[in-house]
């Protein structure tokens, strides 16, 4: 089995607008890869392509030897945090994560409790998610992404709406995930604590890869 994520000439056109324009990358397993660029530069669309959430107009994505859309619909053992929505608003954070874990075949509540603690949320907080602040919602989104100890973790702007303590939590979590061998793809906007963990940084502009640096 291949030990790389291979993105080859990834192109996506939506209503005559090219949102991904021939991106090619090879990302070895176990690294932390940062993606930077202004809003609309293509970061989220690229992450969606790797996660199997969109079909490319042309090109391909293979994750550890399995071509997305051909060998599998989604990367196996994927942890994904793209936004802070999609939860059951009238239930608690613990209920949400325990339910998600159970339908994925995991032991629900223990995994959910551990994930909530890792992101600084109280597993016994009985408040409904509808009462959560944006920062708490962001933490919950990250918790569901790491709950099942993924092989590939994608974090799209995980520091949005977080204070300094929250940004530190994100940096610590990325460090821990890399230490156990997880491959991490993350986008952010100038948080030194997080950027210091990147093995390589890529910049996107208008759907194209602008540069990559060590």
Indicate residue ranges for each PLM-predicted region.
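H-loop/switch region of ABC-family ATPase nucleotide-binding domains
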Residues: 188-189
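Conserved ABC transporter NBD signature motif
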Residues: 59-74
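Catalytic Walker B motif of ABC-type/P-loop ATPase nucleotide-binding domains
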Residues: 153-157
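Helix-to-loop junction immediately C-terminal to a conserved catalytic motif
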Residues: 51
